[in-house]
Amino acid sequence: ADTIVAVELDTYPNTDIGDPSYQHIGINIKSIRSKATTRWDVQNGKVGTAHISYNSVAKRLSAVVSYPGGSSATVSYDVDLNNILPEWVRVGLSASTGLYKETNTILSWSFTSKSNSTADAQSLHFTFNQFSQSPKDLILQGDASTDSDGNLQLTRVSNGSPQSDSVGRALYYAPVHIWDKSAVVASFDATFTFLIKSPDREIADGIAFFIANTDSSIPHGSGGRLLGLFPDAN
């Protein structure tokens, strides 16, 4: 199975798999059952910003999700990624819909990793302020596609309307050196802007930023509440 560390923007509470009874952001370590969550209210049809950072000295993974002029939601969890992730990883964005639906549109995405070691100054930086129609630097999986407006659509959209039972992911093509033999782990920052929109009152399921082994693919049956990340709810 894939090794996944993720930050979820979860728009539908699945209390049967340990979700709180409200929309939330969460930190997931190798399981859809979040290690830490905080309440988050999605604003239907508004552009939001998610900022994820890992401090490799403090060994703390943090996320802040906000809307312009609104309040922000913050969650953090202490974890040593050296013990969890392989030495080389890929970073990606994932989203899903199930019975309920929403657009999972990404308008921009940036990432920077930086090693704390002077010996291994291998770092990676990328910025997408828009997405080309046939992106050579992205690995698109499942229903993910780029549209003529320069946006990344992680799940299926038809004539501007979100579709149910859809799952898609986009990974940056170049692997990231997340730690080396001296056990020095890279710090990183990721930011993406997103638009979640639905004509329905009930929406689902959410967007996640994730880090995985370089050959990671969408697990079979991982749509809906599993956000395209995990094969089951364990």
Swiss-Prot record:
<keyword id="KW-0479">Metal-binding</keyword>
<dbReference type="InterPro" id="IPR019825">
    <property type="entry name" value="Lectin_legB_Mn/Ca_BS"/>
</dbReference>
<feature type="binding site">
    <location>
        <position position="10"/>
    </location>
    <ligand>
        <name>Mn(2+)</name>
    </ligand>
</feature>
<feature type="binding site">
    <location>
        <position position="19"/>
    </location>
    <ligand>
        <name>Mn(2+)</name>
    </ligand>
</feature>
<dbReference type="InterPro" id="IPR000985">
    <property type="entry name" value="Lectin_LegA_CS"/>
</dbReference>
<feature type="binding site">
    <location>
        <position position="8"/>
    </location>
    <ligand>
        <name>Mn(2+)</name>
    </ligand>
</feature>
<feature type="binding site">
    <location>
        <position position="10"/>
    </location>
    <ligand>
        <name>Ca(2+)</name>
    </ligand>
</feature>
<feature type="binding site">
    <location>
        <position position="24"/>
    </location>
    <ligand>
        <name>Mn(2+)</name>
    </ligand>
</feature>
<comment type="subunit">
    <text>Homotetramer.</text>
</comment>
<dbReference type="InterPro" id="IPR013320">
    <property type="entry name" value="ConA-like_dom_sf"/>
</dbReference>
<feature type="binding site">
    <location>
        <position position="12"/>
    </location>
    <ligand>
        <name>Ca(2+)</name>
    </ligand>
</feature>
<dbReference type="GO" id="GO:0005536">
    <property type="term" value="F:D-glucose binding"/>
</dbReference>
<dbReference type="GO" id="GO:0046872">
    <property type="term" value="F:metal ion binding"/>
</dbReference>
<feature type="binding site">
    <location>
        <position position="19"/>
    </location>
    <ligand>
        <name>Ca(2+)</name>
    </ligand>
</feature>
<dbReference type="InterPro" id="IPR050258">
    <property type="entry name" value="Leguminous_Lectin"/>
</dbReference>
<keyword id="KW-0464">Manganese</keyword>
<keyword id="KW-0106">Calcium</keyword>
<feature type="binding site">
    <location>
        <position position="12"/>
    </location>
    <ligand>
        <name>a carbohydrate</name>
    </ligand>
</feature>
<feature type="binding site">
    <location>
        <begin position="99"/>
        <end position="100"/>
    </location>
    <ligand>
        <name>a carbohydrate</name>
    </ligand>
</feature>
<comment type="function">
    <text>Glucose/D-mannose specific lectin.</text>
</comment>
<keyword id="KW-0465">Mannose-binding</keyword>
<feature type="binding site">
    <location>
        <position position="225"/>
    </location>
    <ligand>
        <name>a carbohydrate</name>
    </ligand>
</feature>
<dbReference type="Pfam" id="PF00139">
    <property type="entry name" value="Lectin_legB"/>
</dbReference>
<comment type="similarity">
    <text>Belongs to the leguminous lectin family.</text>
</comment>
<feature type="binding site">
    <location>
        <position position="14"/>
    </location>
    <ligand>
        <name>Ca(2+)</name>
    </ligand>
</feature>
<keyword id="KW-0430">Lectin</keyword>
<protein>
    <recommendedName>
        <fullName>Mannose/glucose-specific lectin Cramoll</fullName>
    </recommendedName>
</protein>
<dbReference type="InterPro" id="IPR001220">
    <property type="entry name" value="Legume_lectin_dom"/>
</dbReference>
<feature type="binding site">
    <location>
        <position position="205"/>
    </location>
    <ligand>
        <name>Ca(2+)</name>
    </ligand>
</feature>
<feature type="binding site">
    <location>
        <position position="34"/>
    </location>
    <ligand>
        <name>Mn(2+)</name>
    </ligand>
</feature>
<dbReference type="GO" id="GO:0005537">
    <property type="term" value="F:D-mannose binding"/>
</dbReference>
